Regions:
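Helix-loop-beta substructure at the N-terminus of cytosolic sensory domains
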Residues: 35-38, 49-52, 259-286
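Substrate-engagement module of ASCE P-loop NTPases
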Residues: 115-116, 121-148
């Protein structure tokens, strides 16, 4: 397929709103839950089956797989606990082996932040992987959990991806607010859009009532705080220190995370740390 050729998403209304997903697009869906992500993955899979194409599911999260192998789905397993470099190279090798014009669905980028204890490495993975997928004319979907990452990490992802789409849902409605759509434009493209279930269209919000209802939902689902100026690891340490000094709580699980991340994976060293270190010693090492 040619570069920037239109590709169907399985949702005609979405294709109309965005002037189509294009070959080479990395699409980041900023969502509140993985259920929101599946609203877009399931139609993509159905469209690819109709077109006789395969979908590669890049599975690396601890949760059950979003898609099962078979019927046009190939599942590729990866382990983030191997570390940033090994994980990134394994993903890159899989992409290289697949070649051009492939279609990918990735697990949640936020799970990489949890595995590596830092937004920085999650962002670095995306900044390395996204351009390679673009180079190979692939289409790739990535979910990102809203409010879980530093503003800097989200900005790095937005800078790199071709599309960044904010998704909001409640019991009645589904909305998309495009934050970035690269290399295409329409007068209404960057307005919030509501999905009309009967027609399948995504219509821009223009009436006062609908706009007010949308921003009320945004306010409800958006958890923005001053801590989002910090990397996730900095937030974790700050919250842990605050909890310890206020409530005297420093659990073995928290100690394991800090010692493994900052110190060593060697069991003998970890045993010595647990014997001789107090919580404030860990905080001092972090400084």
């Amino acid at each position: 397929m040619s570069t920037f050729e239109r590709s169907l998403s399985g949702l005609p209304g979405l294709d109309s709103m965005l002037d189509s997903i294009r070959m080479g697009d990395n699409v980041v869906w900023q969502v509140s839950s993985m259920d929101d992500y599946m609203h877009f993955v399931t139609p993509l899979y159905a469209q690819l089956r109709k077109d006789g194409k395969e979908l590669l599911y890049m599975h690396f999260s601890g949760h059950p797989a979003l898609l099962q192998a078979g019927d046009g789905i190939r599942v590729c397993e990866f382990d983030p606990s191997e570390g940033f470099e090994a994980f990134t190279m394994n993903v890159r090798r899989r992409i290289k082996a697949e070649g051009r014009d492939a279609f990918y669905v990735f697990d949640c980028l936020s799970d990489l932040q949890a595995a590596w204890a830092t937004d920085l490495m999650m962002g670095n993975f995306f900044k390395v992987t996204c351009p390679y997928l673009f180079e190979l004319n692939a289409v790739a979907y990535f979910p990102l959990l809203r409010g879980q990452h530093s503003f800097d990490a989200v900005a790095r992802i937005q800078e790199t991806t071709q599309l960044l789409l904010d998704v909001y849902t409640d019991n009645e409605s589904l909305y998309i607010n495009p934050l970035k759509v690269w290399n295409r434009y329409s007068p209404n493209m960057f307005l919030p859009h509501k999905y009309m279930e009967e027609s399948g269209a995504f219509l821009p919000l223009k009436g006062g009532y609908e706009i007010s209802r949308f921003y009320t939902l945004v306010d409800t689902l958006t958890t923005t705080s001053e801590n989002q100026n910090l990397d996730s690891w900095e937030r974790f340490i700050t919250d842990t220190r605050r909890t310890y000094h206020r409530e005297g709580i420093f659990t073995p699980a928290v100690e394991d995370i800090i010692s493994h991340t900052m110190m060593s994976g060697d069991e003998k060293i970890l045993s010595l740390l647990k014997t001789y270190f107090e919580p404030d010693d860990y905080f001092l090492v972090y400084k």
